[in-house]
Amino acid sequence: KIEKYRKSVSLEAIAERGYDAAVQSTDEEFKSDLTNVVSDRFYAQLKAGSLVGHESTWQMAFAMAIGKVVNKFQEMKRTATGVAVWVNTLDVYKYLGAADITVQTAFGFKYMKNFMGADVVFMTSQIPEGVVIATPLNNMVAYYVDPGDSEFAKAGLQYTTDPTTGFIGFHVQGTYERAISDMFAIMGLRLFCEYLDAIAYISVGDSDTQTL
């Protein structure tokens, strides 16, 4: 499914700050809003995982989250091709202290590779502190439509693909009737997990903390 959005920059804002500053500010805010649409849906599903439990330490919660999803796939007669883990950013730095880590970014998600037995670890404030979420890599599915598709251009709808995210297409044009600059965006990315019962939600502490 392709989703369509529009955001405008007023003539007054351009006159006050200049075209480049006014449009760049709106562009970044627009891009952030659209990225959040994708991530919010995905995180809502991750937080609904049914492999729930709790452990006394963050390190144990991390290990058990991995163990539970690998074990679940084995019970399903499937083989996990790897494991992705989601944690709160502050928990990572509390655990590591001053140690150097290499953090990469893709599609607006910050992540590390090959950390504590996980193939990929995503760091985000969307995950509560003291919670570790995990799922096999091959439990995740992505549907993607290229916003720069030449078929759109043939229809007179030419979009420039945002180089940072890779999944948002932008087009800007002036609208004289309203004296504004309209920014149009299309987005065709959906991330989801095929099996909710292959998502682990492990809390640190004396009890489970998942709320649905």
PLM region descriptions:
Residues 1-78, 91-93, 170-212:
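Flexible, glycine/threonine- and acidic-rich loop/arm segments that mediate assembly and lattice contacts
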Residues 8, 86, 143:
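Residues in well-ordered beta-strands of folded domains
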Residues 55-136:
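Long, positively charged binding patches that form subdomain-scale interaction surfaces
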Residues 106-212:
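Sequence/fold signature of self-assembling virion shell proteins
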